[in-house]
């Protein structure tokens, strides 16, 4: 139980900071989120609810390739449980969960690999997960999702007590998850940041 308190604290901080978005009927309603990502998320959810592989969508942009566009998020496993929700609510849930994922990864990396104190690791985690570098991508949800994996990438790459092959496998898994969340350019920025 004692090991869970940092995660509980991180959750409380994220909820407190993001409450105006997460706990109200407000939505992100400008730019790419409103005009691009909400329609994509709705089209993806419709296809997955119908158990249909969304190769093409005639409803968006006078027709567009869908599965071939990594920004659709079809192949990202953490998007699949969000299928029952409309796009604005699904995005809110994803933002909250990925902020927590970024917080937990930063905490694990700074506590386990950099040997910071619990307080130091918590401060580092809060600074990363709720700082400008990550939150600036909130309107580009796929890039936000990919960036949440960055601290886990650092953690996996240097995991003590594991063979080089195990570290490479874990690092590859984390990169694959980030790559399924966002197009290659965003994945590259996450892995080189």
Q: Each PLM stretch: what is its role?
A:
Residues 1-20:
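Start-transfer (signal-anchor) and selected internal transmembrane alpha helices
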